[in-house]
Every structure is written in structure tokens, then in C-alpha cells.
Amino acid sequence: MNQSYGRLVSRAAIAATAMASLLLLIKIFAWWYTGSVSILAALVDSLVDIGASLTNLLVVRYSLQPADDNHSFGHGKAESLAALAQSMFISGSALFLFLTGIQHLVSPTPMTDPGVGVIVTIVALICTIILVSFQRWVVRRTQSQAVRADMLHYQSDVMMNGAILLALGLSWYGWHRADALFALGIGIYILYSALRMGYEAVQSLLDRALPDEERQEIIGIVTSWPGVSGAHDLRTRQSGPTRFIQIHLEMEDSLPLVQAHMVADQVEQAILRRFPGSDVIIHQDPCSVVPREGKRSMLS
């Protein structure tokens, strides 16, 4: 799984970097030719795209390194750091776009040839849609937080390019302030996306539990297993592609230790079949000691 995960995530990062570099060159020409502030906004965003995607590529490769003596749980948290770094990159670009939009709203400048901007924006829109479709496929296969953050970023680019097309079309009819207004709107949306990305990254770094649906599945597997009377103290988190699952099984006092160990192994294998590549730790408790120990919430 790790080899497939690494291959797909690396390809997604390389594709994003290459696409952003190509679009940057196209947008530099379009901005120089038209003077459109909306295209300038898209140009700045492409610069951020390159920085963010390069960061993703480097960090993802680091996160795929196996566990070592100093990092017993692996390097998967590096993906969350990459997503957090992306949110900072994007917030900076959003602030720049917002300030630029205000400046051009106060002093609008007519574009020299909106038609060139329209052609460039359509090309950028098509390329970005293709990239987002590939990234969405990779996310479905890997659940990579870094690629998901990159995908959300490029999804905002799709909306940006659509808004730029509208702005250029309105500028054709003399609505020159429309260009600046759309730049302001784009800046606000990008900032919202950045804050959402940053929140998700911080939650991962703080070891947020797995989604409720996955925890319910784990509970269902465990409590339905023959020889298991109950379960408690389920603890879960995720680091990169690896889920970490810990749970206490409740078993009859009279069950021999060897048999209890065998049941726990079977439960572990059942969980791994459902969630391949997970790190599972199971503790066995006699039913008689559970009330004295006290139970934490199952969905912890």
C-alpha cells in the first residue's frame, strides 16, 4: 500500500507543479498584454501554486520515509505540516489580491485587449479542471491530506478563472470596475479556503480522531467477534496514510490466556482487512476488572 500511496501522491505533486509552471508563463504574457488586474490576481496565484506544490512534493517524499529510532510512528505528520504551510502561502496571496483589487477599484484602468485575456483564461480553466480531476482520483485512492489541500487550492483556481471570464466579458462592455470587484471576491474566497485548510491541518497535528463512520465500523467489527463480550477505550488518529487504532477488549475471566491472545489477533486481522496499513494495538481485559478500571467513551 505504501508504495502505491507514495507513487500516486508524488505524481499528483509533480503534475501540480508542472501545470502551475506552464500556466504561470501563459499568465505573465496575458497580464503584460492586457493589463487586467484579474489576470494579475491569477498570475500571483500561480506563483503561490508553484511554491505550494513544490513544498508538497518535498514534504510528501519525506513523509513516506519509514519509521526510525527517533520517529517511532513514522513521518506522516509532515503531510499536515505541508497543508499548514499551504494555508499560509494562500493567505498571503489572498491579502495581495485584496489590496490590489481595492487599488484598481479606486483607480480603474481599461484593458487593452480583453480578447487575449479570455483565450488565456479558457486555456487555464481547462488545464486546471483536468488537474483537479486527477487530484480528486488520487485523494479517493490515498486519502492524502497534502493532495487534498492542493486539490482544494486548485478548485478555488477553477472558480477564479470562471470569475475572471465574467470580469473580462463585462470589461468589454465598459464595466472596468468589474475587473477589480471580481479580484476582491476572488481574494476573499481564497482566504476562506486557506483558513479551512489551516484548520484541518491543525486538527490533524492535534491527533483528531478518525471520522465517526470509521470508528463505528471498528466498534462493529470488534463487538460482533466471537469470544469478545464488549469493548471500551477506543482511541484513533491518523498520520499521513497510516491510521492508528487502539482498543480494549472485554473477555470472560475463565478464557485461557492463549485463547484470549488468539481472539485478539483475529480481531486485529479483521480490522486490518477493513483498514489496510493501519497500526493496531489491542489490550485484553477480563470482564470482572472493567467496572473497577472505569471506561472512557468508546468514540474517543
Curated annotation (Swiss-Prot):
Topological category with respect to the lipid bilayer: Multi-pass membrane protein
InterPro entries referenced in this protein's UniProt entry, alphabetically: Cation_efflux, Cation_efflux_CTD, Cation_efflux_CTD_sf, Cation_efflux_FieF, Cation_efflux_TMD_sf, CDF_Transporter
GO CC annotation, single: plasma membrane
GO biological process: intracellular zinc ion homeostasis
Gene Ontology MF term list: cadmium ion transmembrane transporter activity; ferrous iron transmembrane transporter activity; metal ion binding; zinc efflux antiporter activity
Organism: Shigella flexneri serotype 5b (strain 8401)
Protein name per Swiss-Prot or TrEMBL: Cation-efflux pump FieF
NCBIfam families documented for this protein: CDF, PRK09509.1
